[in-house]
Amino acid sequence: MRTPMNNDISGRPDSLNGDRSDVFSPELGEFPNADDRANDIGDMETKTGTTTVGLKTQDGTVLATDMRASLGRMVSSKDVQKVEEIHPTGALTIAGSVSAAQSLISSIRAEVRLYEARRGEDMSMEALSTLLGNFLRSGGFFIVQPILGGVDDDGPHIYSIDPAGSIIEEEYTVTGSGSQYALGVLEQQYNEDLSIEEAKTVAARSIESAVERDLASGNGINVCVVTEDGVEITQHEDFEELV
């Protein structure tokens, strides 16, 4: 810490308002290669790369994701579960930073349990989507783009939530680096009368289409079915059993 000086700064407003230096920076000099280090951390951060999709049916929702994680230009994992249960009848897919997504999921689960303990009832999907949007809008999870799928008293819901916290309820949606390939399949094959099994097939085809073209997606598929009875997540290394 700097030693207090007897300098009078009352006539020097620039000392208070004009000095934009970081108060947490070193007192002498600067951190060496600070910008380069920040860039290196970004390059070496574990990311899901990812293709994730969500579809709404009459009886529930279907979420599907690939299983690959990347570290820079390297495939860091071939067995990542990118869809997680966060509510008795709700699940969340993740695309973006793995660390931010893990923190977001833990925070949301804690808030859901607290809500249930205080009110004695499950949180609605509208309230859950708002909570997610607020978390993302806070900036702490800015590099995550989730899809929320769930069922409540008003029926099935699919929400697309962007990294800035905006919330849009959709019939179907996609996120991730392979989303443009998956979206083409969904637009051709989705309709609101799909059964759960038919929706699983369409979701698998959309993920398979992305895996064939997107380098950051691959290594199998996770499928999550959410109904009023709960959340079921299954893992498949081969697409053939689904399509």
UniProtKB/Swiss-Prot annotation:
Activity modulation: The formation of the proteasomal ATPase PAN-20S proteasome complex, via the docking of the C-termini of PAN into the intersubunit pockets in the alpha-rings, triggers opening of the gate for substrate entry. Interconversion between the open-gate and close-gate conformations leads to a dynamic regulation of the 20S proteasome proteolysis activity.
One GO process term, biological-process aspect: proteasomal protein catabolic process
Name of this protein: Proteasome subunit beta
Keyword annotations from UniProtKB, A to Z: Autocatalytic cleavage, Cytoplasm, Hydrolase, Protease, Proteasome, Threonine protease, Zymogen
Disulfide bonds: none
Disordered: annotated span: 1-40
Quaternary structure (record): The 20S proteasome core is composed of 14 alpha and 14 beta subunits that assemble into four stacked heptameric rings, resulting in a barrel-shaped structure. The two inner rings, each composed of seven catalytic beta subunits, are sandwiched by two outer rings, each composed of seven alpha subunits. The catalytic chamber with the active sites is on the inside of the barrel. Has a gated structure, the ends of the cylinder being occluded by the N-termini of the alpha-subunits. Is capped at one or both ends by the proteasome regulatory ATPase, PAN.
Coiled coil stretches, renumbered: none
Function: Component of the proteasome core, a large protease complex with broad specificity involved in protein degradation.
Record Pfam families: Proteasome (PF00227)
PROSITE patterns: PROTEASOME_BETA_2
